[in-house]
Amino acid sequence: MKQSNRIVVYKSSTGFTKKYAEMIAERMECALADYRSVSADMLSGYDVVIFGTRVHAGMMDGYQKAKKLFEKSGVSRLILFVTGATPNAAAETVEAFWKQNLSSDELAKIPHFYMQSGLCYEKMSLADRLMMKVAAVMVKNKKNKTAQDIEFEQAIRSSYDISSIEYIEPLISYLNSLKD
C-alpha cells in the first residue's frame, strides 16, 4: 500500500544517507526527495516527513536549516535518522550525539534513529578529507591511547561500508506503528 502522506527527504554527501533513504522509501512505498529539491510548499502536502542526514564533525549536517523548512511547511510529524561511521553497538556514543544535537524537548517529541554506514574518502570533499587526515595524525601522535582511540585510529585508515538494510528496521517498525 503506497504511503502517499509520507516522504523521505535526505541530505547526502558520500551516498550513505541516500542509500538508506532509498531503502526506507522503497520499503514504505512512499515518496523520496533530495533535500536540495524540496520547498516548504512541497512538504505541506505530506503528514509525515522522514529526514535523513549524516553525522558531520559530531553534528547533524543541515538539520537546523531543514528544521526551519519543516516548521514553515506545517508538517504534523517529523522523524529523524542520521548515518555515521560509528558502529550501532557504541550506544553511549550515539546517545551522547543525540543529546548534543537535539534539545530535551526535541529528544522527547521527535522520533530519532541512528544507522551505521561508513566512510568514503573518494566521495568526501577536500575539506572533509583534510579534517579526517588531521584527526588521524592527532590520534596517531597521542600518548597513552585509550582503547577507543585505537579503535578510532583503525576505523579512519581507509574507506569502508558497514551499512545494512537491517539498520532501517527500528525506523520501519516505528512507521508501521503509526496510525495515519
Residue ranges and their predicted role:
Residues 3-4, 58-180:
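FMN-binding flavodoxin-like domain, especially the glycine-rich phosphate-binding loop
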